[in-house]
Amino acid sequence: MERGDQPKRTRNENIFNCLYKNPEATFKLICFPWMGGGSTHFAKWGQDTHDLLEVHSLRLPGRESRVEEPLENDISQLVDEVVCALQPVIQDKPFAFFGHSMGSYIAFRTALGLKENNQPEPLHLFLSSATPVHSKAWHRIPKDDELSEEQISHYLMEFGGTPKHFAEAKEFVKQCSPIIRADLNIVRSCTSNVPSKAVLSCDLTCFVGSEDIAKDMEAWKDVTSGNAKIYQLPGGHFYLLDPANEKLIKNYIIKCLEVSSISNF
């Protein structure tokens, strides 16, 4: 088939990237990217995860095949879109969420959005390297009009995983600035409606690097009445890019889903 003859993606396929479809999978894993990130890294997890798992990765507006769409700045509006697009993805099989850094906030709010719409929660919520917004360790994010070029560069390196020589290149920073600003607005908007009690009932696992900038991951236990565990792995904020850590996380996710499936039977 010629490239021009390829079928167009559906709206949902544009929002969720599934590189390796697995109709025989028992579970689906929905992944949420870090600040400035795309969908490809987590979508590739589907290549070497167990046959039990089909992986879908959120593709945010304003990047990749959605580059023509306006960037999203508000977590509530983003979650409304994600919850709607998720319906055909999760309707046939048990599912779990995995989010890293900014993706943890989107994953949590999406789980909450599903519950508020009388939809099932994920079997398990896996969060990585994100200081809970209700924690005293939470640091205020500057307003959009307060952000300097130097601060954008900082966020690119610390939360976007961008190598220093790129993050300090003015032209690169200028190019990335709209996306980073939008993503910072999303994270900043998460500070509204902070839970004062357990709002979910699913099990939760938090991963954090031993030298991570994320703090007080223990506070995520407050948001669910389900079982909650914290695991520290060697490395910094992007500890999960280490192949050994990535393999451990994938294996742990599969084990948790198998156990959850049995206990919920």
Swiss-Prot record:
SUPFAM superfamilies listed in its UniProt record: alpha/beta-Hydrolases (SSF53474)
GO molecular function ontology, one term from the record: fatty acyl-[ACP] hydrolase activity
Coiled-coil ranges (or none): none
Descriptive protein name: S-acyl fatty acid synthase thioesterase, medium chain
Lineage: Eukaryota, Metazoa, Chordata, Craniata, Vertebrata
Protein function: Contributes to the release of free fatty acids from fatty acid synthase (FASN). Has broad substrate specificity, giving rise to a range of free fatty acids with chain lengths between 10 and 16 carbon atoms (C10 - C16).
Gene3D superfamilies referenced in this protein's UniProt entry, alphabetically: alpha/beta hydrolase (3.40.50.1820)
Keyword entries, A-Z: Acetylation, Cytoplasm, Fatty acid biosynthesis, Fatty acid metabolism, Hydrolase, Lipid biosynthesis, Lipid metabolism
Major subcellular location class: cytoplasm
GO biological process: lipid biosynthetic process; medium-chain fatty acid biosynthetic process
Location within or outside the cell: Cytoplasm, Cytosol
Substrates-to-products reaction catalysed: (9Z)-octadecenoyl-[ACP] + H2O = (9Z)-octadecenoate + holo-[ACP] + H(+); decanoyl-CoA + H2O = decanoate + CoA + H(+); dodecanoyl-CoA + H2O = dodecanoate + CoA + H(+); tetradecanoyl-CoA + H2O = tetradecanoate + CoA + H(+)
Native species: Homo sapiens (Human)
EC number(s) reported in the record: 3.1.2.14
In-chain residues carrying the UniProt-annotated modification N-acetylmethionine: M1
PANTHER family registered for this protein in UniProt: S-ACYL FATTY ACID SYNTHASE THIOESTERASE, MEDIUM CHAIN, THIOESTERASE
GO cellular component, one term: cytosol
